[in-house]
């Protein structure tokens, strides 16, 4: 019988050759058994009974989500070679083999007041996503961060009877702990990437899965990681002065509210070269309005290389703060938005944690200085940047804090570990 099974398996992923099937039956079966095995083989090879490829629908709404989703997709394809992947995201997801329905640069909206102004657009995007998922009918929908959008999407996915996996928890521990009830109701499996999130969800009796942080993978596997400062300068046509990197974010609102304040530092440090880390979703035209009075170079597609070679960095709050820490470049964390005093009041009212940067949250103490809202001004930026640009106590303490954070994050390989977990969990849903 083992020979028969081996022959049948040959046909699993190939067009059915009926004459050869009959030959197998005649060669390996006799008498009454011949009829039984013929029936079993034809049933096994019938198209509707053959194993269908798994269909994964992935939704990421910003550059960091695009990065993590792309590495997750690579892991899914490694362990499930026939996987079909479709979703909302960016260029990195597309390069990893995902069919992109809508790019995140057309959907990303941030800030309290900006969201209120764009409610109609948000509703239209949710409905478009809804219809596409129903039409494609995936085996699972994997939501990646981007809680404001994805938790709304999760509601109708659940109603449609499609398993909902959440990869990279929305930061409800910072903004809205009340959403835990919603997550418990709508999300079948939660996969978190920060160790403190395991304890957070445990307080609400909601088990989650943790396998490390995918940023460690992305940075560990980055190209040019052995590049020297002089090589980087030569390739990019820079002056050779020490570099101060400006990581101003990947969304237009971030450029509008943060980049102009970062650029006030240019005149204070003539012995350094300021370089903007160009976001993949942006073009020169997006940066041009802010560079009319200052001469600053923009380098696209090399953020890790730039930050690694920089003497210091000014970084918009978010994933980039942790990336900068893993790369061991001293930084000042920057965050601002429209609305002035009103936004600051809303910010202080709704933020539930002591720190906003991931570096400080993971460390459980202040490792990097955070300049938020009204505190993000020229005077404060000058003071904090001056403290870390040269050798000294502040710089040394920050680098030591980075070492603590990196130890807590653990080893590389998280993306593949999460992919394996998801495939195993999904197999349980399929029975």
Regions found by a protein language model. Give the residues of each.
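Intrinsic low-complexity, disordered N-terminal segments enriched in polar/charged/small residues
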Residues: 7, 24-30
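Nucleotide-activated sugar donor-binding and catalytic core shared by glycosyltransferases
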Residues: 7-10, 43-431
């Amino acid at each position: 019988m083992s020979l028969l099974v081996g022959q049948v398996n040959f046909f699993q992923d190939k067009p059915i050759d009926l004459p050869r099937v009959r030959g197998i039956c005649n060669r390996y079966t006799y008498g009454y058994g011949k009829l039984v095995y013929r029936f079993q083989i034809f049933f096994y090879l019938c198209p509707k009974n053959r194993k269908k490829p798994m269909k994964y629908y992935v939704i990421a709404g910003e550059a960091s989500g695009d990065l993590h989703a792309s590495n997750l997709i690579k892991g899914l394809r490694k362990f499930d070679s026939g996987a079909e992947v479709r979703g909302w995201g960016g260029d990195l997801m597309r390069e990893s083999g995902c069919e992109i329905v809508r790019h995140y640069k057309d959907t990303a909206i941030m800030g309290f007041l900006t969201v209120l102004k764009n409610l109609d657009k948000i509703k239209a995007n949710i409905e478009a996503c809804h219809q596409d998922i129903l039409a494609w009918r995936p085996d699972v929908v994997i939501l990646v961060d981007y809680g404001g959008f994805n938790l709304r999407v999760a509601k109708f996915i659940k109603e449609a009877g499609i398993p909902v996996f959440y990869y990279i928890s929305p930061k409800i521990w910072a903004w809205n702990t009340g959403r835990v009830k919603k997550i418990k109701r709508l999300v079948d499996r939660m996969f978190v990437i920060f160790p403190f999130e395991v304890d957070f969800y445990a307080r609400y009796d909601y088990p989650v899965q943790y396998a490390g942080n995918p940023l460690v993978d992305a940075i560990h596997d980055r190209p040019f990681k052995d590049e020297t400062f002089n090589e980087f300068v030569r390739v990019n046509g820079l002056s050779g002065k020490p570099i101060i990197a400006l990581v101003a974010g990947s969304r237009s609102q971030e450029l509008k509210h943060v980049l102009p304040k970062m650029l006030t530092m240019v005149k204070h440090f003539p012995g350094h070269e300021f370089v903007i880390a160009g976001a993949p979703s942006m073009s020169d035209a997006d940066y041009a309005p802010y560079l009319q009075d200052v001469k600053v170079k923009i380098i696209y597609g090399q953020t890790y290389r730039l930050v690694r070679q920089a003497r210091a960095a000014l970084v918009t709050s978010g994933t980039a703060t942790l990336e900068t820490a893993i790369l061991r470049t001293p930084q000042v964390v920057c965050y601002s938005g429209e609305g002035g005093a009103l936004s600051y009041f809303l910010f202080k009212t709704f933020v539930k944690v002591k720190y906003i940067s991931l570096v400080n949250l993971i460390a459980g103490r202040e490792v990097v200085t955070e300049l938020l809202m009204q505190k993000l001004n020229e005077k404060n930026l000058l003071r904090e940047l001056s403290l870390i640009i040269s050798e000294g106590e502040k710089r040394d303490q920050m680098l030591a804090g980075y070492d603590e954070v990196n130890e807590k994050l653990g080893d590389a390989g998280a993306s593949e570990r999460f992919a394996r977990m998801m495939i195993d969990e999904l197999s349980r849903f399929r029975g």
